[in-house]
Structures are given as C-alpha cells and as structure tokens.
UniProtKB/Swiss-Prot annotation:
It catalyses: K(+)(in) + H(+)(in) = K(+)(out) + H(+)(out). The lineage of its organism: Bacteria, Pseudomonadati, Pseudomonadota, Gammaproteobacteria, Legionellales. GO terms for cellular component: plasma membrane. This is Probable potassium transport system protein Kup 3. Its main location: membrane. The gene is kup3.
Length: 629
C-alpha cells in the first residue's frame, strides 16, 4: 500500500491535528459545504416543484444522504486518500504515480489529463453558482432586492479575482474558523427542522431513495442531476491531500462537516414536509426571520471562501501540469513565504474571471446555472474511478475480482450521475465540456510539440569527446570565468555550447552543462536534488531534479553548489540559453497545419526560460536558432 502521511498516526488530542483539521474546513470543504444553498432546492424543482409528495421529499433527501456516504465518505475519504503520490493527492498526482510505475502509460495519461481538464471546466461555474445562491437570500429578505442580486454577485466576484495577486495568506488564516462556524450554523438550523418533524430521520434508510429512484421513471433519473450537486466538491477532498494529510481531512469530515451537512439536508426536507413553499430558497427558510440577514452575510462569506479554494486549486493544478510538461511555462508568483501553495498565476486568474463573469451574467441565477453544473465534475469522478481501479489492482495488489467489485460500485454510481447530467448538455452543460476539450487539446498539443523540438535539438548534440577534441585542435582559449549552459540532454554537448565556441573562439575555464529534470513525484528529496559529474577538463554535467510541486530556481541551486566547495563564483556566472523560433512550412493536411500553428502560438507566448528559472537578466546570453516543424 502506498505510504501515507505520518500525521495519520496522531490521536485526536494532538493540537497539530486539531489545527490542521480546522484549516482543512476552510480549504477542503468550502465547495461541498456550501452545496446546501442550492442542492435540495434544485432536486425539488427537478421533481416537479410545487407541493411535492411525501415519497418525493423522503426519497430525494435519502438519495442525497447516501450519495454523501458512498461518494464522499467511502470513495474519497476511505479509499482515495490512502493512494498518494509521496503525500500529494488529486487526479494529476494519481496519474503521475500510476504512469511512473505501470505499463498502461498512454491510457493512464489520457484519463488523467481529461479528468484535470474537466476540473477546469466546472471550476468556472463553482464561484458563480456559489456566490449567486448566497446573495439570492436577499430576495427572501425583501422581494424588491432581487434586482440587486446580480450586480452584487458580479462585484463580489470581480473583487475576489482582483485581490488574488496580493495573496490571501493573512485572511486565509480566518477561513478555517469561519467555515467551522458555518458548519455549526447549518447543522443547528437543520437540527431545528428535524426536531419539528422527526419522522424525516427515516430517510436515512436507503430504501426510500432506491424506491423513489426506480418507481418514478424518468423523474427519478432526472433528479440525479440535482442530487449530484451535493458532492461536486468531493474531488477537492483528494486534491488537497498534500496540504493537510489524511488524518486532518478525515477528522474535519466526520467530526463536523459530514454530520452538519446531513442535519441540514434533513432539516430542509422536514421543512418541506411541514408544507413550506418551494418557490424560494428552502435553505434560508430554515432560519428565523431575525437572523436571516446575518445568515445571508455568513453564506456570502462561506461561498467566497469556497470560490477561493477553487481558484487556488486551479493555480496549483496549473503548476503541476507545467512541471510535468503538459502546459507551457507561465509566470508563477509566490505570494507568501509561509506556504508553498500560496501562489498566483495571472493568466489563469484572469481567464477564470472572464469565464466566471460570463457565466454569471449569461445565466443570471443559481437555478439556471444548475442546468450547466455537474456534467464536467461527474465525468472527472468517472476518470478518478478508472484510475482508482488500476491502483487497487496494481498498487495494492488486490485481485481483479475484488478490485472490480469495489471500483464497480463506484463506477455504477458515477456512471449514473454522469448519464443523468448528460441531459444538461443542451441547457448549458456543453460549456464546461467545451472548455475541458479545449484545455485537453492544448495540453496534448503542447506536450507533442515540445517532444518534437526536443528530438530536433538532440540531433544537433555532439559527444563530449568530440567536443574536447575540436577545441584542442582549434586551440580555443580558456578564460577564467564560469558559464552555465542549459540543455535537455544529460550527457552530450548542447548546440548552444558548440555555437558559442565556434563564433567566439573562447571558452570559460569552468563550464556547467545543466539539465532540469522534472520528476513525476511532488517534491525531490534534498539529497537527490543535484547530481554533478566532471566529464572533461573544467566541464561538468549536472542534473537538477524538481518535483511537480516545486519551482526551479537555478541561482539558488548554484549558490548551494558554491557553498559545497565547488570553484565557482555565483556573482560572475554567465547563463547561456537557447531561444528557438519555431515556424511551420509545407504542411498539406489542414488539421495538422492548424495544430502546429497553435503550438507555435503557445511557444511564442510561453514565459521566457530566463524568467521561469529566475536567472538574473544582466547575466543571461540568449542564442537564437530556427526550428521547422
């Protein structure tokens, strides 16, 4: 079984565990924790609205409860959290782990990348539907306020995206306590409804859900679209494993989040059983009138926190994809020294903002947005289940039957939700699916194009022996300086070094040929960071290893090398990097031509290598060359 975090061995009295569990409430459970704002309301509307029958109410809430149990508690909390890639979770980390150890690499990578692309697709909807559903509580406070809902939601979203570059480390410390208060509040409100109509507790029996599902034909099938909304944030349970570890996530779930959600959904169902109107948001009707405005404010803050988690997750996943070679280099800004996860990627932030605002304005209400929400994340969960099956069989060494039975249960549930959500395609579900296809295509095109360039560059490499022989024959002068040449191959001499000697007829007496090696693990062990070997007189070949959660910083790396006794002066280094100009010529096939043109566009707009590796501009020498693809 793959290793798990040491924190898992701590007991409940451990103050570190309690602190991490509190933090997990603010980051991990924001999305799933704000789902009661719109889930039960959507389910009742899909069931026909109006005054629903008792079996409809009981069946609906029973399906919600058991979806939370099967998907969130069993699939993600019990199984997925135990399959980590050196402590990291999420579909890209799982893809990297499996592709590193198994032979089914193309299939695993295709499934993993599609799952990641789908997360981006639904990630544009989550902030919109969450904030809208919270602000819509104003309509219950006063019907005349409904005209202000959309402008307020847009203002909140713009502000949220605008402050990302400043970092959220300071206010982020309050996320955990705020979400803890949120879960306590919704749990108490729900318990209040259950006390008024305790017979609703019978819905915990799964027979109610199954009976409603199979005895109501198309209606029973369609409401699965609404039921699924209760677990749209479940993928975050796995993705945030690296931030907190297994034990805090489990502790926060079973200790507060899960019981609070169950009580709230039961409370909403109890309220409808009592005859409450379903025209307005049922969630807010649980609240006594005097406390409605504070609840609306708390709901808005909770949805902002949920949206922040989505945005931060998008930044983190983008960095992973870049380090694994599936996206071009983008500028990554560390917004806080307190945590490596505190980063900002401007391009991702503004594109996400434009997409989210477009959806908010285009759909206008959480009820309409629910028609587009869920299809992409349900497909992501299918992808995760496929990889989970492979992990159970290949990594945990379970036999094929046991692995199939466990994963098969999840597959049936996931496939049912995905099939139901496909009915949303025309009504808006095509939007996240289209976005996912675009992102997947970009990742595939970038990776294939980058591989093509790497192959063409290696063709120009020469051996160390040939290079040393040539500089001796040509009597190349060695000057007392240090030069670093970046390369994509570990052993040979890169073309930029050959060009440098050919044009300048001099060579520094200390030459480091450096390859940056991106690993399929989150972080490289300090002892494995750098391997360096002298392959010729004053010529060293070095390989620097970085995990997909790490950002290469070459000057800091070389400073450590200098501290270890190597005769280099960090202040007197010249960095030589290749600057490729890619062009397309004589492509007859139209599709192939446009694919190559897209790659050229991405390559030209990628962050320069010198910026990405934090090289001092005054010490960088770029050598240009043209490459035809």
């Amino acid at each position: 079984m793959p290793s798990t975090r040491n924190i898992e061995t701590h007991n409940d009295s451990n103050p570190t565990l309690r602190a991490l569990s509190l933090s997990a409430l603010g980051i991990v459970y924001g999305d799933i924790g704000t789902s009661p704002l719109y889930t039960f309301k959507t389910v009742i509307l899909l069931a026909g609205g109006g005054t629903p029958a008792v079996n409809t109410i009981m069946g609906s809430v029973s399906l919600i409860i058991w979806t939370l149990i099967i998907i969130a508690s069993v699939k993600y909390i019990h199984f997925a959290l135990r399959i980590d890639n050196d402590g990291e979770g999420g579909i890209l980390a799982l893809m990297s782990l499996l592709s590193l150890k198994l032979k089914q690499r193309p299939f695993i990578i295709a499934v993993g990348l599609m799952g990641a692309a789908l997360i981006y697709g639904d990630g544009t909807i989550t902030p919109a539907i969450s904030v809208l559903s919270a602000v819509e509580g104003l309509e219950i406070l006063s019907p005349s306020l409904k005209y202000y809902v959309l402008p307020i939601a847009i203002t909140i979203l713009i502000t949220l995206f605008a402050i990302q570059s400043k970092g959220t480390a300071t206010i982020g410390k309050a996320f955990g306590p705020v979400m803890a208060f949120w879960f306590l509040t919704i749990g108490i409100l729900g318990a209040r409804g259950v006390i008024q109509h305790p017979s609703v507790l019978a819905a915990i029996n799964p027979i109610y859900g199954l009976s409603f599902l199979f005895s109501n034909g198309a209606t029973g099938f369609f409401i699965l679209c609404g039921v699924f909304l209760c677990v749209t944030g479940a993928e975050a349970l796995y993705a945030d494993l690296g931030h907190f570890g297994t034990a805090p996530i489990r502790c926060a779930w079973f200790g507060l989040a899960f019981p609070s959600l169950i009580f709230n959904y039961l409370g909403q169902a109890a309220l409808v059983l009592e005859g409450a109107s379903t025209e307005h948001n049922i969630f807010y009707m649980l609240c006594p009138g005097d406390f409605l405005l504070p609840l609306i404010i708390l709901s808005t803050v909770a949805t902002i926190i949920a949206s922040q988690a989505i945005i931060t997750g998008a930044f983190s996943m983008t960095r992973q994809a870049m380090q694994l070679g599936w996206l071009p280099r983008l500028r990554v800004t560390q917004t806080s020294s307190e945590g490596y996860g505190q980063i900002y990627i401007g391009v991702v932030n503004w594109l996400l903002m434009l997409a989210t605002l477009g959806l908010t304005i285009g759909f206008g209400s959480s009820e309409k947005l629910a028609a587009a929400y869920g299809i992409a994340v349900s497909a992501t969960m299918l992808c995760t289940t496929l990889l989970l099956f492979i992990a159970l069989h290949k990594l945990w060494k379970w036999d094929i039957i046991t692995s199939g039975l466990v994963a098969g249960l999840f597959m049936i549930v996931d496939a049912s939700f995905f099939a139901a959500n496909l009915t949303k395609f025309i009504n808006g579900g095509y939007i996240p699916i289209t976005l996912a296809i675009i992102i997947y295509s970009m990742m595939y095109i970038w990776h294939k194009g980058y591989q093509t360039i790497a192959i063409k560059q290696k063709e120009k490499n020469i051996t160390v022996a040939s290079f040393l022989d040539s500089i001796q024959k040509e009597r190349v002068v060695r000057v007392p300086k240090t030069a670093v040449f970046l390369t994509s191959k570990e052993q040979d001499i890169p073309p930029i070094l050959v060009w440098h000697v050919k044009k300048n007829h001099v060579l520094q007496d200390k030459v480091i040929i450096l390859k940056i090696n991106n690993l399929s693990i989150p972080r490289c062990k300090p002892g494995d960071r750098l391997q360096i070997v002298e392959t010729g007189t004053g010529i060293w070949h070095a390989v620097a290893n970085y995990g997909f959660m790490e950002q290469p910083h070459i000057p800091k790396l070389l400073k450590k090398l200098e501290a270890q006794g190597y005769d280099i002066n960090i202040k007197d280094i010249t960095y030589y990097i290749g600057h490729e100009t890619i062009f397309v010529r004589n492509v007859r096939h139209t599709l192939s031509k446009y694919i190559k043109i897209l790659f050229v566009f991405m390559h030209r707009n990628a962050l320069p290598m010198s910026n990405y590796f934090h090289l001092p501009p005054e010490s960088v020498f770029e050598i240009g060359r043209q490459i035809e693809i």
